[in-house]
Amino acid sequence: MLKQMTVNSIIQYIEENLESKFINIDCLVLYSGFSRRYLQISFKEYVGMPIGTYIRVRRASRAAALLRLTRLTIIEISAKLFYDSQQTFTREFKKIFGYTPRQYRMIPFWSFKGLLGRREINCEYLQPRICYLKERNIIGQCFNFRDLVFYSGIDSKCRLGKLYDSLKKNTAITVSNRIPFHDKTNDIIARTVVWDRNKHFSDSEIKVDKGLYAYFFFNDTYDQYVHHMYNIYYNSLPIYNLNKRDGYDVEVIKRRNDNTIDCHYFLPIYCDDMEFYNEMQVYHNNIVKPEMSVTLGLPKS
């Protein structure tokens, strides 16, 4: 129990300080009061990798998110995450992800290969099912939100509050999000559209593109929604080597009588060859061929 509490505390400390100061094992020894050896053994036992590797890849993964979701310059991101120079940042980033920071920002899809999200002890990450959705033209009510760390900050909770207000009036809602949706600031902007077939109450019209989607399902309390969405992006996608395609996603959120929600989440993924299906078969045999359409009771557009 003591080891587990120590590792959880170390993980929390790392997350809170990635953009506050340079972190290494010496910082953690000073923070925790435990020896280097004890921390290394305990961390490796529960997380499966050395502390130094975890810090290095988490820092690069935060940089990857900032490259894709903000307009901060490479120099600004390098300084924000306490790399000693832009050259060091570029070299380290390419070693981990196979792209330079500039290349990573410019590729037409969001690559999650090699990314590492915040690890949680004894956590089982959601497994995707690959499916195909047809193109849909959608009308609905639109709002934007911004957050410097995707699905983890105050603004994401404000978005959650708006969705909850809609859900209180209905047993189920369908929403689509486009991430990122940039404005002229450097903040992460996302556009959320709550589907509504009533044109009098709708202020936006969007298109959900046809193509492959990674389908995730979870049932939990509403408070855990943000937690699940973070893990889908920063843990499930890297584990299953999936890349995010630009475009609107689809969420079907259903309210249950036990104060929990069912969330059916369809995330657009990028795939340029059919070998992808063979790779996914390694993880599960529940794949849906692209000629099939998954509806799950989605409201008609």
Swiss-Prot record:
List, for all copies, the residue spans of the domain called HTH araC/xylS-type: 8-107
What Gene Ontology cellular-component terms does the record carry? cytosol
Classification via Gene3D superfamilies = Homeodomain-like, Regulatory factor, effector binding domain
Tell me, what is one Gene Ontology molecular-function annotation carried by this entry?
DNA-binding transcription factor activity
Q: Which UniProt keywords apply?
A: Activator, DNA-binding, Plasmid, Transcription, Transcription regulation
Residue ranges of DNA binding: 26-47, 74-97
Q: Which GO annotations describe the biological process of this protein? A: regulation of DNA-templated transcription
- The reply on keyword Chloroplast is no
Give the domain of life. Answer: Bacteria
Q: Which SUPFAM superfamilies match?
A: Homeodomain-like, Probable bacterial effector-binding domain
Q: Does the keyword Transcription regulation apply?
A: yes
Main function: Positive regulator of F1 operon expression.
Show the PANTHER family listed in the entry: HTH-TYPE TRANSCRIPTIONAL REGULATOR YKGA-RELATED, RIGHT ORIGIN-BINDING PROTEIN
* Protein's name in the database: F1 operon positive regulatory protein
Instruction: Tell me the gene name.
Output: caf1R
